[in-house]
């Protein structure tokens, strides 16, 4: 009997003890749920039959050009066009709209919201584009 016990002990020594798992030390008192697998959604049908058209296209972004005396001075001296723009338009959308509608590159755009609640944009054109020619082409000179 003792020989059988000795053989069993020898086997366990050779295999090693694998049944003790070291516990992870928790350093925080808050339990953070582990990240689990999130499968991509596969809807059975579309929730909207037709996607909504763009709310701000180029024609909505630029409302109209401003041709006041100060705007004319900007055109002549600073190579800058002045526009009324949609209140929710930002500088990036204004730049893209000017490029698409008038096919000129804008270098810089300054915007301000006027006291009457409309937004005004000062579009500085690149050196190769002449603001006077663009204004003539648009038709507000």
Swiss-Prot record:
**Pfam families with a match to the protein in the record:** Ribosomal_L23 (PF00276), Ribosomal_L23eN (PF03939)
Could you tell me what this protein does?
This protein binds to a specific region on the 26S rRNA.
NCBIfam families reported for this sequence: PRK14548.1
Family per record: Belongs to the universal ribosomal protein uL23 family.
Q: Which domain of life is it from?
A: Eukaryota
One GO biological process this protein is involved in is: cytosolic large ribosomal subunit assembly
UniProt keyword annotations, A-Z:
Cytoplasm, Ribonucleoprotein, Ribosomal protein, RNA-binding, rRNA-binding
Q: How does it assemble?
A: Component of the large ribosomal subunit (LSU). Mature yeast ribosomes consist of a small (40S) and a large (60S) subunit. The 40S small subunit contains 1 molecule of ribosomal RNA (18S rRNA) and at least 33 different proteins. The large 60S subunit contains 3 rRNA molecules (25S, 5.8S and 5S rRNA) and at least 46 different proteins. uL23 is associated with the polypeptide exit tunnel.
Would you name any one GO CC term? cytoplasm
Any idea what this protein is called? Large ribosomal subunit protein uL23B
Gene3D superfamilies given for it?
3.30.70.330
Under the heading InterPro entries, the entry gives: Nucleotide-bd_a/b_plait_sf (IPR012677), Ribosomal_uL23-like (IPR013025), Ribosomal_uL23/eL15/eS24_sf (IPR012678), Ribosomal_uL23_CS (IPR001014), Ribosomal_uL23_N (IPR005633)
UniProt source species: Schizosaccharomyces pombe (strain 972 / ATCC 24843)
Annotated Gene Ontology MF terms?
rRNA binding; structural constituent of ribosome
**Annotated region (Disordered), positions in chain:** 1-22
Q: Which PROSITE patterns match?
A: RIBOSOMAL_L23 (PS00050)
Predominant place of localization? cytoplasm
Other observations noted: There are 2 genes for uL23 in S.pombe.
Compartment list: Cytoplasm
């Amino acid at each position: 009997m003792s020989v059988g016990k000795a053989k069993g002990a020898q086997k366990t020594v050779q295999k090693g003890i694998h049944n003790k798992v070291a516990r992870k030390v928790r350093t925080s008192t808050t339990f953070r749920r582990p990240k689990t697998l999130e499968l991509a959604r596969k809807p059975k049908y579309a929730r909207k039959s037709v996607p909504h058209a763009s709310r701000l296209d180029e024609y909505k972004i630029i409302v109209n050009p401003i041709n006041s005396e100060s705007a004319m001075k900007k055109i002549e001296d600073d190579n800058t066009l002045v526009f009324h723009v949609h209140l929710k338009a930002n500088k990036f959308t204004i730049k893209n709209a000017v490029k698409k509608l008038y096919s000129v590159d804008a270098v810089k755009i300054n915007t301000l919201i006027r006291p009457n609640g409309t937004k005004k944009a000062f579009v500085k054109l690149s050196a190769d584009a002449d603001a006077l020619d663009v204004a003539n082409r648009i038709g507000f000179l």
